[in-house]
């Protein structure tokens, strides 16, 4: 930490105070954002933090002038938080920032126009990020992480401030997205429901009115929720919206969306092009797509095993596992086509024995009972049209379209 | 002022205990005294209440109940009535008393509770107490009167004990004056304690002598005690003049004079009673007719009350010695033996007094009695009707009369009942449970005086009638308070000696020369005996109170000054005691309505306290209760200072919260204290008294220290219970108070218990019960090791076996934390269970994902985990063939969890088949594929056919269409079935989720 003289420290602090008060009085949101954006680690903020560590009695400076003391509470907490943040005491920094955020939100509530919306966004973002960092600290110290949860309730409060009729309401979706991030991180996604309900049903909100970036984020998260619920058509709609509307230059974001959209599309019977997977570095799906194309059950299982951890964490494992039935369908289709070539007259009769043999080639050792079971499931789920003659151990396929394509419809349950 | 006065007065009265308590805080003193008394005082309270009741009865019951006592009580009531003006205060004090009573009750529980109630009622008499008391009182009175009439004479003999009661009455008075019932209570406590709750009084006043007295008291006091209660009432009446209280206190030592004085003021002038009155009353008690006289004069009545108290206290003390310890039960028991009748009567009196009290009281005793009698009758009936609420109070009364006892909870005074109902019910149960001990007591009670004798004889706790008569005579000879004091001391010694010689019941007390009272006058000896009895009583009571008291402590009692302060205090007590919302509510009510409501709350709290004690008794038995009492007394002391503030804050939710936390803290502390007390013998009352006192002192110190500390600063490790119970089998009962080390099994015993359960051939319900109790003991002792894991694992497996998923879930969540703490166990086995459970029963994708992602590669190699994962795969894909194959090869208890999914899987499978297969499927195939042959089947023909039958049955109940082909084979007509298949409503669905658990088993278990 570079040495800072007392005078220099005094100067820096006073400058910050001046800029803050100017920003507020001129309603200069962008300046205010810069002044509050801790995580940007901007040089002015870092030097101010150093100055604060030298010049301990910053509160006297705030009190010095009426101009500063009007926002004395806000500024004092900002300083304390920045100070702690600079020295790496993230928990303290979070606590001070939380107080600041509360004071700021209170102040924001009193401002009639929504000029400070951007600054509020910064505050919401910073509090969430700080809380995550503080929780990491707490966990490494063996304490229970609880700051993110606290940040969640603060964000909820902010949401309440914005959910009104005035011009501030367009900020509600940003806060909602921050809440989603918080809840997904905490694993309490069920808490999202109440926010979603108010966004989607409250008349004060017109979804199209919100900023695009927030809409994309919102759709991404709600799409993920639908994946959890295995509601694939809805997930498809939401994630597709996110994909179509997100900034095409943000490849990371596109990849995040595709990570969920690809499995969703797969379970709807829509197979992506290899380039897509390549372009967005989604190689974990490559094998799965191949397995689906080939009807290679073994490949599917290998692919699932290979990336099990990743799929489990992202929550698509179960979705991908269910592709198994489509793989079976593909396999049956191949057997059927094969049989058609050799014996067109009896092509629509698939012997269970033959299926078992095919599976054995794939290293899937199944007896007839199990094969029959799988065939009944395929028929039941309408992946295969026809019936199973138990007595003769034959699957009799329908003459018309024995293997109907899903074409965007989910596998019936 | 009043408080101060009271305290001071008290101090003189009971130099040791009282002074200590009182000495601590002028204002707080009362509280302290309460607290102390709670432990020991509580008994006093009970005693007081009893007295009050007795007094009320006195008018009525005096003749009936303990004639002497009744008169006293009657006067008390009468006095109280006069005092009405001061009622607000008195009412408050009454509440306080009630609260104390409650705590005290714990030991004597039922009886004391009632007494307390009645006491409260008495105190209320001043203000509104009478009303409340009247409710309960009337009932008691009725009963008491009946019994009382016969008993009174005998009880009169016990005057000594009565003397003790006077002190109670003094307390009452104090409350009335003070409103700081506390001060009064304290005094009362001392006296009462001496009389009924040996602990307080004894500790301070005449510990040694008390013991002796106790014995004596027990014999005599019981009967007398009821009168004491009456006295208390009178004392409450006395409340008017604080000065009187002081006098009372002093007199307390000389119970009579003091009591009388208070009574006189309280009651009205009744009898300027003080000493002379008391002395008079004492003798009077002996004769019912006298009682009336005393009634006319409060003082006499007071004296009587004292006696009753002593009696009550004695019985309690004696009974406490017995395992009966359970608060209610014990109380009942105690009362039942000696005072039973009396105590109960007092409550009745109180109740009655509220109803009719004033008139009755005011009127000559006889007249009152008449009036009361009717009331009593009513009250009794009412008691019967609303046993729950009033029962506690009534119970005391019931104790007096066996009938009453049986009805015990009869006291259904609407007000009380409402508050007490739950408690009463419990009480009822308890009483029934206690039946063995209680029943006798009750019987004796029912047999008014004669019964008392018998009871005394049968029950060690009770003193023989002849002894009572002897004591009465001795007291009758006393010319002044001093004489009475000395007489009491002497009597105590005599009784103690007799007890030690085991001649208590064999000696011919009727012919015993009064000169034996030696040194001081007979009266003195009597008074001393009264004190002793009161002390004995108090000690048990105190403990219960203390438990509650901790809560009370939480509340600041700074505000006692207001007229309602006493009520407030009472309310506070209630709050503290109860920690319950009811108490706070009652407080609020009290504030609004002043006396009456507070009393109720007090009653409620008392009831609650009773209930809790009862439970405890069940758990630990007498010894445990005794310990509890001590602890409670300590807590009470601490609490007293807070009362005033508590009163003020009681209403607020915040305060409630704080109270709760405090109460919890106290519970822990109490538990700790109990731990200290463990060494104390449960049954040895005398020995216990000393030890109890010592513990109480220790505890009080602890409390004082802890009081200033934040809950967070408490070293919980130091407070962790260390069990001493050596019983391997123990039934599970949900703890409602701090655990008692005497009922907690140490680790090595728990280990044996676990093995016992594992080897047991009994059914799941038994094992579940045993395991729950083991778990409880482990939790209470904060044991977190492999044994804990083993217990939970065992229980989880058994629960799985029995299909008890809720219990299984409890165990699993505990096991998760245990494994997370690094405790070794079968973590993989349970990881598998957990996986299966989520897959098969919770069907939560996110949960499944997260639990799957927690498994390491290593974990997945475990057979059970691998199996569980395969099952999951089979279920998600609907592969029924795989599922039932896995079912047959399931390791551990995996199949038990799968069992619960079999039905769904079969339904799914048949649904699949009937939709996909044409035209038919042989049933034999279904049998084979869907595991109808049973997991363990080896494929023998017999089992095959069994499976066939099962399968057909299953198919039929699910709407399948079965046809028979030419070969006689059964076939499933798939086309017809596909549309007719349905999932039947489970016929044998039971709320607990397992039809294997017979409902009747549950009922028999509870």
UniProtKB/Swiss-Prot annotation, chain A:
Keyword Nucleus: yes
UniProt KW keywords: Nucleus
Phenotype of null mutants: No visible phenotype, when grown in absence of ethylene. Extreme ethylene responsivness, when treated with saturating ethylene concentrations. Curly leaf.
Name the record gives this protein: Enhanced ethylene response protein 5
UniProt key word S-adenosyl-L-methionine: no
Domain PCI: 216-402
UniProt organism field: Arabidopsis thaliana
Tissue specificity of this protein: Expressed at low levels in roots, leaves, stems and shoots. Detected in seedlings, roots, leaves and anthers.
Function comment: Involved in the regulation of ethylene response. Probable TREX-2 component required for nuclear RNA export. The TREX-2 complex (transcription and export complex 2) functions in docking export-competent ribonucleoprotein particles (mRNPs) to the nuclear entrance of the nuclear pore complex (nuclear basket). TREX-2 participates in mRNA export and accurate chromatin positioning in the nucleus by tethering genes to the nuclear periphery.
Gene Ontology CC: one annotated term: nucleus
Biological process per Gene Ontology, one example term: response to ethylene
Curated annotation (Swiss-Prot), chain B:
Feature: compositional bias, Basic residues: 609-618
Parts forming coiled coils: none
Pfam families, sorted: SAC3_GANP
Signal peptide span: none
Biased composition range(s): Low complexity: 116-140, 516-539
A GO BP entry: alternative mRNA splicing, via spliceosome
Effect of gene knockout: No visible phenotype. Sac3a, sac3b and sac3c triple mutants show no visible phenotype.
Region annotation Disordered: where it falls in the sequence: 1-75, 106-162, 183-239, 266-326, 516-550, 595-638, 650-690
Subcellular locations according to the entry: Nucleus
Compositional bias segments (type: Basic and acidic residues): 653-680
One of the record's GO cellular component terms: nucleus
Protein keywords: Nucleus
Residue ranges of every copy of the PCI domain listed in the record: 804-978
Compositionally biased tracts (Polar residues): 26-75, 106-115, 144-162, 269-282, 313-326
Superkingdom field: Eukaryota
Family that this chain belongs to: Belongs to the SAC3 family.
Quaternary structure (record): Interacts with EER5, SAC3B and CML20.
Record's function text: Component of the TREX-2 complex (transcription and export complex 2), a muliprotein complex that functions in docking export-competent ribonucleoprotein particles (mRNPs) to the nuclear entrance of the nuclear pore complex (nuclear basket). TREX-2 participates in mRNA export and accurate chromatin positioning in the nucleus by tethering genes to the nuclear periphery.
Name of the protein in its database record: SAC3 family protein A
Natural source organism: Arabidopsis thaliana
Gene: SAC3A
């Amino acid at each position: 930490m570079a040495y800072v003289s007392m005078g220099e420290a005094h100067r820096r602090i006073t400058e910050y105070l001046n800029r803050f008060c100017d920003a507020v009085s001129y309603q200069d949101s962008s300046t205010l954002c810069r002044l509050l954006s801790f995580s940007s680690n901007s040089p002015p903020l870092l030097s101010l933090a150093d100055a604060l560590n030298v010049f301990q009695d910053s509160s006297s400076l705030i009190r010095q002038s009426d101009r500063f003391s009007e926002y004395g509470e806000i500024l004092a907490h900002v300083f304390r938080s920045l100070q702690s943040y600079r020295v790496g005491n993230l928990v303290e920094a979070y606590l001070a920032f939380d107080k600041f955020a509360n004071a700021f939100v209170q102040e924001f509530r009193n401002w009639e126009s929504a000029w400070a919306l951007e600054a509020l966004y910064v505050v919401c973002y910073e509090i969430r990020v700080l809380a995550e960092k503080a929780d990491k600290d707490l966990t490494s110290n063996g304490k229970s992480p609880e700051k993110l949860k606290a940040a969640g309730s603060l964000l909820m409060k902010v949401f309440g401030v914005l959910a009104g009729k005035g011009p501030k309401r367009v900020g509600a979706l940003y806060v909602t997205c921050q809440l989603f991030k918080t809840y997904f991180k905490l694993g309490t996604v069920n808490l999202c429901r109440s926010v979603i309900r108010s966004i989607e049903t409250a008349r004060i909100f017109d979804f199209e009115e919100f900023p695009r970036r927030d809409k994309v984020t919102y759709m991404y998260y709600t799409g993920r929720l639908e994946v959890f619920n295995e509601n694939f058509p809805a997930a498809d709609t939401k994630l597709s919206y996110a994909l179509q509307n997100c900034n095409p230059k943000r490849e990371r974001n596109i990849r995040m969306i595709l990570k969920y959209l690809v499995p969703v599309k797969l379970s709807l019977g829509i197979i992506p092009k290899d380039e897509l997977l390549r372009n967005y570095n989604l190689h974990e799906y490559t094998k799965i797509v191949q397995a689906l194309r080939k009807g290679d059950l073994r490949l599917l299982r290998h692919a699932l095993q290979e990336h099990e951890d990743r799929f489990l964490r992202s929550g698509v494992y179960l979705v991908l596992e269910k592709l198994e039935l489509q793989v079976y369908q593909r396999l049956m289709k191949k057997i059927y086509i094969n049989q058609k070539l050799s014996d067109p007259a009896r092509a629509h009769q698939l012997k269970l024995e033959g299926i078992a043999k095919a599976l054995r080639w794939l290293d899937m050792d199944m007896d007839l009972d199990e094969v029959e079971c799988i065939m009944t499931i395929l028929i039941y789920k309408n992946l295969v049209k026809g019936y199973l003659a138990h007595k003769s151990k034959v699957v009799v396929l329908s003459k018309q379209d024995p293997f109907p394509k899903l074409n965007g419809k989910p596998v019936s349950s | 002022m009043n408080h101060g006065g009271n305290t001071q007065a008290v101090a003189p009265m009971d130099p040791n205990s009282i002074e200590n308590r009182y000495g601590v805080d002028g204002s707080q003193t009362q509280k302290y005294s309460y607290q102390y008394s709670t432990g020991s005082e509580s008994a006093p309270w009970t005693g007081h209440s009893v007295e009050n009741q007795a007094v009320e009865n006195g008018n009525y019951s005096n003749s009936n109940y303990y004639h002497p006592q009744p008169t006293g009580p009657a006067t008390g009531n009468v006095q109280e009535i006069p005092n009405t003006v001061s009622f607000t205060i008195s009412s408050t004090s009454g509440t306080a008393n009630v609260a104390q009573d409650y705590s005290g009750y714990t030991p004597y529980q039922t009886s004391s509770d009632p007494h307390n109630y009645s006491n409260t009622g008495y105190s209320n008499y001043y203000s509104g107490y009478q009303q409340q008391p009247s409710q309960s009182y009337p009932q008691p009175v009725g009963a008491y009167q009946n019994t009382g009439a016969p008993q009174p004479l005998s009880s009169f003999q016990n005057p000594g004990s009565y003397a003790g009661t006077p002190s109670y009455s003094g307390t009452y008075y104090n409350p009335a004056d003070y409103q700081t019932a506390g001060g009064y209570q304290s005094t009362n406590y001392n006296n009462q304690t001496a009389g009924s709750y040996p602990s307080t009084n004894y500790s301070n006043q005449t510990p040694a002598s008390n013991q002796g007295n106790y014995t004596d008291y027990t014999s005599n006091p019981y009967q007398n005690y009821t009168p004491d209660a009456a006295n208390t009432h009178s004392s409450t009446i006395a409340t008017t003049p604080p000065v009187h209280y002081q006098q009372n206190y002093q007199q307390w030592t000389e119970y009579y004079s003091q009591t009388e004085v208070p009574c006189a003021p309280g009651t009205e002038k009744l009898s300027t009673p003080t000493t002379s009155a008391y002395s008079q009353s004492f003798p009077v008690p002996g004769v019912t007719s006298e009682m009336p006289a005393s009634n006319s004069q409060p003082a006499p009545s007071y004296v009587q009350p004292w006696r009753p108290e002593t009696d009550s206290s004695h019985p309690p003390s004696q009974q406490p010695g017995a395992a009966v310890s359970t608060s209610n039960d014990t109380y009942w028991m105690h009362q039942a033996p000696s005072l039973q009748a009396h105590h109960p009567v007092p409550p009745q009196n109180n109740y009655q007094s509220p109803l009719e009290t004033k008139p009755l009281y005011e009127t000559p005793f006889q007249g009152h009695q008449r009036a009361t009698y009717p009331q009593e009758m009513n009250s009794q009936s009412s008691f019967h009707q609303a046993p729950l609420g009033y029962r506690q109070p009534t119970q005391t009364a019931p104790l007096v009369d066996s009938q009453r006892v049986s009805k015990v909870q009869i006291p259904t005074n609407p007000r009380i009942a409402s508050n007490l109902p739950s408690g009463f019910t419990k009480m009822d149960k308890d009483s029934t449970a206690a039946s063995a001990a209680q029943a006798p007591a009750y019987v004796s009670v029912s047999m008014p005086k004669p019964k008392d004798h018998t009871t005394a004889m049968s029950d060690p706790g009770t003193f023989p009638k002849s002894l009572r008569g002897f004591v009465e005579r001795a007291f009758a000879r006393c010319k002044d308070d001093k004489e009475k004091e000395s007489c009491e001391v002497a009597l105590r010694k005599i009784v103690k000696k007799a007890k030690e010689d085991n001649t208590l019941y064999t000696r011919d007390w009727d012919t015993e020369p009064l000169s034996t009272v030696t040194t001081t006058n007979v009266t003195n000896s009597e008074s001393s005996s009264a004190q002793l009895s009161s002390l004995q009583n108090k000690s048990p009571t105190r403990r219960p109170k203390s438990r509650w008291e901790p809560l009370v402590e939480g509340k600041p009692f700074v505000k006692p000054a207001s007229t309602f302060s006493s009520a407030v205090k009472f309310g506070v007590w209630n709050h503290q005691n109860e920690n319950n919302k009811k108490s706070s509510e009652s407080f609020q009510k009290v504030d609004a309505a002043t006396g009456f409501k507070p009393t109720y709350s007090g009653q409620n709290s008392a009831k609650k306290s009773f209930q809790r004690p009862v439970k405890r008794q069940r758990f630990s038995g007498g010894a445990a209760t005794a310990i509890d009492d001590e602890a409670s007394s300590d807590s009470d002391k601490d609490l007293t200072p807070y009362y005033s503030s508590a009163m003020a804050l009681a209403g607020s939710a915040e305060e409630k919260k704080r109270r709760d936390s405090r109460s919890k803290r106290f519970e822990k502390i109490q538990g700790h204290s109990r731990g200290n007390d463990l060494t104390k013998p449960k049954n040895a009352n005398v020995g216990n008294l000393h030890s109890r006192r010592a513990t109480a002192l220790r505890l009080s110190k602890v409390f004082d220290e802890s009081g200033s500390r934040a809950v967070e600063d408490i070293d919980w490790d130091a407070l962790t219970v260390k069990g001493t119970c050596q019983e391997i089998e123990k039934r599970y009962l949900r703890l409602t108070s701090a655990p008692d080390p005497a009922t907690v099994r140490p680790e090595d015993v728990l280990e044996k218990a676990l093995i016992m359960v594992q080897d047991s051939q009994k059914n799941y319900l038994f094992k579940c019960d045993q395991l729950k109790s083991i778990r409880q003991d482990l939790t209470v002792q904060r044991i977190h090791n492999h044994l804990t894991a083993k217990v939970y694992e065992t229980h989880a497996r058994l629960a799985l076996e029995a299909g008890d998923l809720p219990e299984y879930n409890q165990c699993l969540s505990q096991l998760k934390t245990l494994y997370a703490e690094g405790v070794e166990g079968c973590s993989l086995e349970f990881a598998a269970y957990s996986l299966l459970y989520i897959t098969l029963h919770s069907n939560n994708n996110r949960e499944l994902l997260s639990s799957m992602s927690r498994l390491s590669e290593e974990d997945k190699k475990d057979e059970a985990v691998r199996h569980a994962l395969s099952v999951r795969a089979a279920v998600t894909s609907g592969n029924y063939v795989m599922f039932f194959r896995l079912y047959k090869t399931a390791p551990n208890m995996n199949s038990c969890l799968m069992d619960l999914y079999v039905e769904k899987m079969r339904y799914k499978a048949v649904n699949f088949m009937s939709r996909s297969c044409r035209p038919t499927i042989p049933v034999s195939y279904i049998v084979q594929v869907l595991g109808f042959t049973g997991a363990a089947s080896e494929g023998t023909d017999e089992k095959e056919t069994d499976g066939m039958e099962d399968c057909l049955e299953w198919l039929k109940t699910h709407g399948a269409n079965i046809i028979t082909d030419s070969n006689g084979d059964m076939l499933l007509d798939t086309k017809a079935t596909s549309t007719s298949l349905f999932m039947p409503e489970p016929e044998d669905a039971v709320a607990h989720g397992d039809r294997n658990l017979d409902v009747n088993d549950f009922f028999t278990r509870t």
